[in-house]
Amino acid sequence: MAQVSMRDMLNAGVHFGHQTRYWNPQMKPYIFGARNGVHIINLEKTLPLFNDALAELTRIASNNGKILFVGTKRAASDAVKAAAVESQQFYVNHRWLGGMLTNWKTVRQSIKRLKDLEAQSQDGTFDKLTKKEALDRTRDMAKLELSLGGIKDMAGLPDAIFVIGADYEHIAIKEANNLGIPVFAIVDTNASPAGVNHVIPGNDDAARAIQLYLDAAVAAIKEGRGQETVAAEFVAEEAAE
C-alpha cells in the first residue's frame, strides 16, 4: 500500500508554511504554531489525511479512473508532467485555461485542431505550404501543445484532479466543484481548503515536498492499476532515505 511516513515529510520540508501575515484562518486546524514568523504545519494532521487520499487515489485508479494532475507554478510544472507521464495519466502544467473542464466541448475542438496539425506535420502537408504558412502552423501547434498536450488523449472529463497548490489553482478547483469531480489538493497555510474534497495540508513551494507528493500519488495510482511492485519499491525507497 502506497504510504508516506512522518520522516518522509519532515525530510522534504512539508511542515514549512508561509509567513504568518499571509495566513488563511481556515487553515488554523492544520497549523501547529509559528517559528521565526513562519507557520509550521501540524504533520500529525497531514499524515493521516495524505495517506487516506493515497488510498482513495488507488481506489479510483483500480476502477480505471482518469486522474488529472494540475500544477502550473514554476516549482511544480516539470515534476507534474513527469508524474502524469510515469503514471499514464494526464496533466496541465503550463496555464489553466478558463473552461478547461466546464467548457469541455470547446476544449475538445482545440484538441482536434492540435491533432490535425500534428498529423499534417508528419504527413508532408507542411512541406507543401509556403514558408510563412508552415511557420504559422508550427507556432499554432506548439502553442496548443503547451496548453493541451497533457490532456489531448484524455477523451473526456477526469474522474479526479490532483492539485499542487490550492491557492494558485483555484480556478481548476472551482470548475471541478461545478462538475462534481473530486479534488485532491496540497493546501498551504495561505490558501483556502474550501472546495477541496481531500485536503493535504503542506508546503506547496519546496521542490522536495512537491516531489514527495507526486511520487506518492504515482505509486498509489500504479498500485491501483495492478503495478504493486513499483508502488512497493516507492515505499521501500522512502523508508531507506
UniProtKB/Swiss-Prot annotation:
One Pfam family cited in the UniProt record for this chain: Ribosomal_S2
Ribosomal protein recorded as keyword: yes
Keywords: Ribonucleoprotein, Ribosomal protein
Transport among keywords: no
GO BP of this protein: translation
InterPro entries assigned: Ribosomal_uS2, Ribosomal_uS2_bac/mit/plastid, Ribosomal_uS2_CS, Ribosomal_uS2_flav_dom_sf
HAMAP family: Ribosomal_uS2_B
Protein name listed in UniProt: Small ribosomal subunit protein uS2
Gene: rpsB
